[in-house]
């Protein structure tokens, strides 16, 4: 790793000399020696005769960047970029180049993490507040969250939200027959394990008999039909039910929004706001509610608060709803959503403004009217926005073939009906080709007055000031400059794996051959993408030791959910549907418990020892107590305590002996690749985080991809899809067959360029850096957990509880002070309150790791001054952190520390820093005074 001749050498931040330096501090002779000391012998893979790890030895040899890009180009060229007029929730759109260059292709945006440290995340928090304002303005509701995974999962969350809000014994929901097919399928998946009964009906005739807690309708419907649902909403409310409407945001620039007709919830996707179809994703879904249901919302919610100087500031609000706190009682298991795509959609709306969006909508509608006018009596619905449904008895296949011959894909509803969807990219030429396919001549457009909206929208300056490219470019730069992303600094967040997202990995995702593919396009159009999917599935099988992989889950949370559903269906297929107990260690991430609850399982907590390991005696006791009903054990490996538990094989065997399945959470797979395979040491199923281990960027909180990998006996129960007969027959968990398919080339490129040796080296280097940090910082902050040989895995936990007890300085103080030193804080208070979990990853250099250590040592010296009484506990640079440039320029400075100590604690030559945009934020104030849309400009005066 000295001459940087391979991609792996450029991905890994340490050269051979730096590795030797770290190993000397750790006290081991080599990387292999470290692996032997850290990883239990019973699971550590022995290298094959070729020198590669088992499984990985079957991967293709590492390719150069040029070779990998050439192979990706060949895969892209195997696709056909047809004009998509399929619709069904996915539409072509024009991504403004200024947004493509300054957001999607900008590491300042795509390498950031979820804004848990809001003082150094104000830029993307503002962008997300813009997104929430966009959604609330267009839907006519008061509160929207900061994105959902896609429209189908947003619908499922809307259903469970209504069930929680209804607070009654009724477990029936009615779904209109004109809801998108894929949405209905995801709803059915979510409903079954929760015991919710779905009644499907044509709701134009009103509600069917019986009691319901909720009603779900679509606007416009899958057939294109626009229905006035106001009478249905009133009827539902009269019968004690809530109403959720899946609404097209572009259509809502013209038609009355759900909130104005009385609906309680709106859900959908923002895909057509500048986000490519991408063979299914990623796209930002949305969910909006009335303010009284705000605490029922799932996922992230950005709110306005104030900092310690009284300045308005943004933060994540109402976090007590979320899985990392409420575990199996959470509103949802969602963590990562689609922040990067939400930012893109928000800026698309800002760039076009209300007038521009309305003009696009009118143009789309005009093209639909032109087609409808020519179809005449063949037209099925007389009110539509963008999608026209035509009756063509026995001719559907002929019409599709004629359009396809001229480069346009239409949608076959059945043998007698074809639908045509217009979008932002539709032209008069496309309309002419469509009419020719139907065999009709152009005629006068069928003018339909659908403009029932009277309320204004997007009047805030965020949507009126940035119409020129110059102003938008500068706005995006100004926002990015407020944040710490990987382009500025190491982000040592434990359990998050903030590694390099290489430019060569990212390059192909903007190619139209990948981006402009409809997820339901003919298979002949997507041969290259399908080969890429097959490659990736086979490589992940080799890496994990499992037998099959589904790439459909579009987040780690959904991978967990899919894996647990597969386990449940497996037990049911064996005549044991009663197996519903899920054992989860007390140290587990809250998502595990939330996912188990969504899968209809009952969580039983297994105790852990003081060293973090699972208490085997308690595990055996719980297994024995629940043997007849035991469904699964969920266990993270390496553990959430940052160590390799040496009893993992025994733990798995105990569960298997009782008829249970073992779910190995793959969140920490970056410490296993090339060293041990969960499918070989006892796991039956794992989800993987491609946005952690395999280089898909975090995007400030999404997109993510959470494939689920299983042993052969669970493979038949992997997610299926109503429009993908090639998939297994399991239940779909995402709207698209292959989830967020357009970002899969990132992981494909990473594996292809790293090869077997590079992948193993990445794991070993990550472990080396973590152990080096543990050794350097242990005398200042005790390392809470180590394995049997005194080693950690790829992350370490620094214990500040004793420091807090002695000095009053908290983990929050240290996290905020790190911003003054130019660093993003590690993970706070997980898995143990009062601690920091540090994960350096393999991509960081020795210089960067040393700088982080020096910052932490400098902070410890400051803490000692507080402990010695030199600085009072309520007025010191830690409690005052972070310090903005504005506060340092104040005429009055009455603190016992200097301005220089506040701003540059290790001197101006230490490292470049991102100045925090605000002082420490008052979280409680923001939750008490909930504001989740753009505040007026006067608030900042």
From Swiss-Prot:
Cofactor(s) demanded: pyridoxal 5'-phosphate
Gene3D superfamilies linked to this entry: Aspartate Aminotransferase, domain 1 (3.90.1150.10), Type I PLP-dependent aspartate aminotransferase-like (Major domain) (3.40.640.10)
Enzyme Commission number(s) from the entry: 1.4.4.2
Residues the record lists as N6-(pyridoxal phosphate)lysine modifications: 692
Keywords: Oxidoreductase, Pyridoxal phosphate
GO biological processes: glycine decarboxylation via glycine cleavage system
Pfam families listed in its UniProt record: GcvP2_C, GDC-P
Catalytic reaction(s) noted: N(6)-[(R)-lipoyl]-L-lysyl-[glycine-cleavage complex H protein] + glycine + H(+) = N(6)-[(R)-S(8)-aminomethyldihydrolipoyl]-L-lysyl-[glycine-cleavage complex H protein] + CO2
Record GO terms (molecular function): glycine binding; glycine dehydrogenase (decarboxylating) activity; pyridoxal phosphate binding
Family per similarity comment: Belongs to the GcvP family.
Assembly behavior: The glycine cleavage system is composed of four proteins: P, T, L and H.
Cited HAMAP family: GcvP
Biological role: The glycine cleavage system catalyzes the degradation of glycine. The P protein binds the alpha-amino group of glycine through its pyridoxal phosphate cofactor; CO(2) is released and the remaining methylamine moiety is then transferred to the lipoamide cofactor of the H protein.
Protein name: Probable glycine dehydrogenase (decarboxylating)
Naturally occurring in which organism (per UniProt): Mycobacterium tuberculosis (strain ATCC 25618 / H37Rv)
């Amino acid at each position: 790793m000295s001459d940087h001749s391979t991609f792996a050498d450029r991905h890994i931040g340490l050269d051979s000399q730096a590795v030797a330096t770290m190993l000397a501090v750790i006290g081991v002779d080599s990387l292999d020696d470290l692996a032997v000391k850290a990883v239990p012998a019973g699971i550590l893979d022995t290298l094959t005769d070729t020198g590669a790890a088992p499984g990985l030895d079957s991967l293709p040899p590492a390719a150069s960047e040029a070779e990998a890009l050439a192979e990706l180009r060949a895969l892209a060229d195997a696709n056909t970029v047809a004009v998509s007029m399929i619709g069904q929730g996915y539409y072509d759109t024009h991504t403004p180049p200024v947004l493509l260059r300054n957001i999607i292709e900008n590491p300042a945006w795509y390498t950031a993490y979820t804004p848990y440290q809001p003082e150094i995340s104000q830029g993307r928090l503002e962008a997300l507040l813009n997104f929430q304002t966009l959604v609330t303005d267009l839907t006519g509701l008061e509160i929207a969250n900061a994105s959902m995974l896609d429209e189908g999962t947003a619908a499922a969350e809307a259903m469970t939200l209504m069930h929680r809000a209804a607070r009654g014994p009724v477990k029936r929901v009615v779904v209109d027959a004109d809801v998108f097919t894929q949405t209905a399928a995801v709803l059915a998946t979510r409903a079954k394990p929760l015991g919710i009964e779905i009644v499907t009906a044509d709701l134009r005739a009103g509600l069917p008999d019986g009691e319901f807690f909720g009603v779900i309708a679509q606007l416009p419907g899958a057939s294109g039909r626009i229905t006035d649902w106001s009478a249905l909403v009133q009827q539902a409310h009269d019968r004690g039910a809530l109403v959720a409407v899946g609404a097209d945001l572009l259509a809502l620039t013209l038609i009355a929004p759900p909130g104005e007709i009385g609906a309680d919830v709106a859900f959908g996707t923002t895909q057509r706001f500048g986000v490519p179809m991408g063979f299914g994703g990623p796209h930002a879904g949305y969910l909006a509610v009335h303010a009284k249901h705000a605490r029922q919302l799932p996922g992230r919610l950005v709110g306005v608060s104030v900092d310690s100087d009284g300045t308005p500031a943004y933060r994540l609000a109402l976090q007590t709803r979320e899985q990392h706190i409420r575990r199996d009682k959470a509103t949802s298991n969602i963590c990562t959503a689609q922040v990067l795509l939400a930012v893109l959609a928000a800026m698309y709306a800002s760039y076009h403004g209300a007038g521009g969006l309305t003009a696009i909508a009118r143009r789309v509608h005009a093209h639909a009217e032109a087609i409808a006018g020519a179809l005449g009596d063949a037209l099925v619905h007389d009110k539509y926005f963008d999608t026209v449904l035509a009756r063509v008895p026995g001719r559907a296949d002929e019409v599709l073939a004629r359009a396809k011959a001229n480069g346009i894909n239409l949608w076959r509803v059945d043998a007698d009906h074809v639908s045509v969807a217009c979008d932002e990219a539709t032209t008069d030429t496309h309309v002419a080709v469509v009419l020719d396919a139907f065999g009709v001549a152009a005629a006068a457009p069928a003018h339909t007055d659908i403009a029932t909206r009277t309320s204004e929208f997007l009047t805030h300056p965020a949507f009126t000031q940035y119409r020129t490219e110059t102003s938008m470019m500068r706005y995006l730069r100004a926002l990015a400059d407020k944040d710490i992303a990987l382009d500025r600094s190491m982000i040592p967040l434990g359990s998050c794996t903030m590694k390099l997202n290489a430019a060569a990995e990212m390059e192909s995702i903007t190619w139209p051959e990948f981006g402009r593919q409809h997820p339901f396009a003919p298979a002949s159009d997507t041969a290259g993408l399908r080969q890429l999917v097959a490659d990736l599935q086979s490589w992940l099988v080799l890496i994990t030791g499992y037998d099959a992989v589904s790439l459909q889950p579009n987040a780690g949370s959904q991978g967990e959910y899919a894996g647990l559903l597969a386990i449940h269906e497996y037990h049911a297929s064996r005549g044991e549907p009663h197996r519903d107990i899920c054992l989860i260690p007390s140290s587990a991430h809250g998502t595990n418990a939330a996912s188990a609850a969504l899968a209809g399982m009952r969580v039983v907590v297994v105790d852990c020892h003081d060293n973090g390991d699972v208490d085997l005696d308690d595990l055996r006791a719980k297994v024995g107590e629940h043997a007849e009903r035991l469904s699964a054990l969920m266990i993270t490996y390496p553990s959430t305590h940052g160590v390799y538990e040496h009893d993992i094989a025994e733990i798995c065997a105990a569960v298997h002996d009782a008829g249970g399945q073992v779910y190995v959470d793959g969140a920490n797979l970056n410490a296993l690749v090339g060293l041990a395979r969960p499918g070989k040491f006892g796991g039956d199923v794992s989800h993987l985080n491609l946005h952690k281990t395999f280089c898909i960027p975090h995007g400030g909180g999404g997109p993510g991809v959470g494939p689920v990998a299983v042993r052969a006996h669970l493979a038949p129960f992997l997610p299926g899809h109503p429009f993908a007969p090639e998939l297994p027959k399991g239940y779909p968990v995402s709207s698209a067959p292959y989830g967020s398919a357009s970002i899969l080339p990132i992981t494909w490129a990473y594996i292809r360029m790293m090869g077997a040796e590079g992948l193993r080296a990445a794991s070993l280097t990550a472990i080396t850096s973590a152990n080096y940090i543990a050794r350097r910082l242990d005398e200042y902050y005790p390392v809470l957990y180590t394995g049997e040989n005194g080693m950690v895995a790829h992350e370490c936990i620094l214990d500040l509880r004793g420091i807090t007890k002695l000095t009053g300085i908290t983990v929050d103080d240290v996290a905020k002070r790190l911003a003054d030193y130019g660093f993003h804080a590690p993970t706070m208070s997980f898995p143990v309150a009062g601690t920091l979990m540090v994960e350096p990853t393999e991509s960081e250099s020795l210089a960067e790791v040393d700088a982080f250590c020096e910052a932490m040592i400098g902070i410890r010296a400051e803490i000692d001054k507080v402990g010695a009484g030199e600085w009072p506990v309520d007025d010191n640079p830690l409690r005052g952190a972070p310090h903005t440039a504005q506060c340092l320029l104040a005429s009055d400075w009455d603190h016992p520390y200097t301005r220089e100590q506040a701003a540059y604690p290790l001197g101006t030559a230490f490292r470049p820093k991102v100045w925090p945009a605000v002082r420490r934020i008052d979280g409680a104030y923001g939750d008490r005074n909930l504001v989740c849309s753009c505040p007026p400009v006067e608030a900042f005066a």
